[in-house]
Amino acid sequence: MAVWQAASGKVYLPPSTPVARVQSTDEYVQRTNIYYHAYSDRLLTVGHPYFNIYDVQSAKIKVPKVSGNQHRVFRLKLPDPNRFALADMSVYNPDKERLVWACRGIEIGRGQPLGVGSVGHPLFNKVGDTENPNSYRQQANSTDDRQNVSFDPKQLQMFIIGCAPCMGEHWDRALPCVEDKPPPGSCPPIELKNTVIEDGDMADIGYGNLNFKALQENRSDVSLDIVNEICKYPDFLKMQNDVYGDSCFFYARREQCYARHFFVRGGKTGDDIPAAQVDEGSLKNVYYIPPMTNQPQNNIGNAMYFPTVSGSLVSSDAQLFNRPFWLQRAQGHNNGICWFNQLFVTVVDNTRNTNFSISVSSENTEVSKIDNYTSQKFQEYLRHVEEYEMSLILQLCKIPLTAEVLAQINAMNSNILEEWQLGFVPAPDNPIHDTYRYIESAATRCPDKNPPKEREDPYKNFNFWNVDLTERLSLDLDQYSLGRKFLFQAGLQQSTVNGTKTVSTRGSIKGIKRKRKN
C-alpha cells in the first residue's frame, strides 16, 4: 500500500514509485444487459438442538446436531457461462473474451414461524443470584453447587455474501513462552485466531466468541450446545480491509440482547481481589474494608460475576429474510463477480428457534388405552428444523483477454486463468498411441504411476451446504417472484433480441396535457 512515512526528521516523505495498485472489477469487467434468475429447492434439515446423538455400538451419528444458533454456510454452484449456447453469438467473442457471473440481487427465504428457543445446562455453574440478595451467602460445605439452569440466547440475524468463504474470529488458548512457563492451575494465555466459518459452527449466543472446549475445563460455565464447541464471529474488520473483497460483497446484521439474570460462579477464585496480601499491605482497603471476624462477610464470596442474556422480543417487523437485497456497489474491489462460478452465503437466524418436544410411550401403547398418566412411561425427545430457499439475479459479464487484464487476474488468483484454459497449447504429436487391454495384469508393463492431476478443490477440507444451481437458471425473469421485483424496482422491461432475452429501461409515457379553461 502507498502510505506516507516519517523520515529521520519531522518531514513526511511520499511513497516511492511505482506502487502496485489493485483495480476494481468495474475497471475491466464489461456488463451486458442479459440477466438470469437462479433458484434452489426447499432446503430442509432436522436434528437435535444441543448435541449429536450417537449409536452406542458403533459411535456413528444417528441424529446430527441442528441448532438455530449455528451458522448455515451455503456454497452455491453456478454453471460455467462460457459453455452456454447463446442464441446471439454477438454477445462475446470466445477468442478474445471470457464470460463471468455478477450477483445483482439475492433473496434468502426462511420458512417456519417465529419462535424463541431456550438453551441451558443441567449442571450449570451458578452458585447464587447476585442481583437482589437479602442476606450474605454462607460458604456451603458442598463441593458441588451446580444447578439446572436454562435461558434464551442472544437474538441474532445476519447474512454475508461473497465468492469466498466468510472469515471468522475467536479467542483460543495460546502457547506460553518457554522461559516463562506458567505453573499448573494458572490462567493460560489467549490469542485471537482467524478461521473459515463452516456450516454448523456455533455463533455467539451471549458468552463471546471463545473456544469453550479448550478454555472451560469444568464443562459447566455455558449451555450444552456450546460447552464443547467453538463460537465464531465474522471478522468484519478483516474482510472490509481485504485487498480484493472476495469474502464479503455486502452483509446485513441485526443483534440484540439484554441481561436478564445476574449470577456468580462457583469454584476457587484464580485471581484474588488485591488487598493487604500485596506488597506488604500497600493495597490494603483499596477495594474493600475487611469485615469483623464474627460476621458472615468475613468469609468473602466469589467475585466471578456474569449475566444470563436474553434476546428479548422476536417480531416480524425486524426481519432481514424473505425480502430482496440489490447489489449496486460492493464494499471491496470485487463488485459482485462470482469467480470460479460459485457463491458463498453465510447465514445465522435464531428468530425461528422453536424446539419441538416429541413424546412417545415407552410401552408402545395406544393413547386411548392408557389408564392413567405416569411420567416414567413416556420418553421425551427434542428436535429442531430449519427451512431455507435461495433466489438470485445474475448478470452476464465479459472480460477482455488483454495483457493488462490477464496480469491483474494472474496476480489475484492464477487458478482463474487455468480454469479458463488459457495455458500454452502444444503442437499435435503422433496421433497413434499404445493402449493395453489388460494393463493391470502381471504380463504387461506397469501402468503410469503419475496420471495427470485434476485441479483440487481449495475448500475440500471444509464443511459447507453444497447447493447445485447448474441447471436452475432461467431467462424468464417475469415468471419468478424475485425476477419481477428486479424488473419493477428499476423500471425495467424484458425484450427478445436475436433470440436472447435482454433487459432495457422502460420508456416513460407522457400524459395528455389538458387545455386550461378560461
Curated annotation (Swiss-Prot):
Self-assembles into homopentamers. The capsid has an icosahedral symmetry and consists of 72 capsomers, with each capsomer being a pentamer of L1. Interacts with the minor capsid protein L2; this interaction is necessary for viral genome encapsidation. Interacts with protein E2; this interaction enhances E2-dependent replication and transcription activation. The keyword Disulfide bond applies. Keywords: Capsid protein, Disulfide bond, Host nucleus, Host-virus interaction, Late protein, T=7 icosahedral capsid protein, Viral attachment to host cell, Viral penetration into host cytoplasm, Virion, Virus endocytosis by host, Virus entry into host cell. It comes from the Viruses. Forms an icosahedral capsid with a T=7 symmetry and a 50 nm diameter. The capsid is composed of 72 pentamers linked to each other by disulfide bonds and associated with L2 proteins. Binds to heparan sulfate proteoglycans on cell surface of basal layer keratinocytes to provide initial virion attachment. This binding mediates a conformational change in the virus capsid that facilitates efficient infection. The virion enters the host cell via endocytosis. During virus trafficking, L1 protein dissociates from the viral DNA and the genomic DNA is released to the host nucleus. GO terms for molecular function: structural molecule activity. GO terms for biological process: endocytosis involved in viral entry into host cell; virion attachment to host cell. Residues 131-142 have a biased composition (Polar residues). Residues 128-148 are annotated as: Disordered. GO terms for cellular component: host cell nucleus; T=7 icosahedral viral capsid. It holds the Pfam family Late_protein_L1. It is found in: Virion; Host nucleus. Belongs to the papillomaviridae L1 protein family. It comes from Human papillomavirus 14. SUPFAM superfamilies: Group I dsDNA viruses. Its main location: virion. This is Major capsid protein L1.
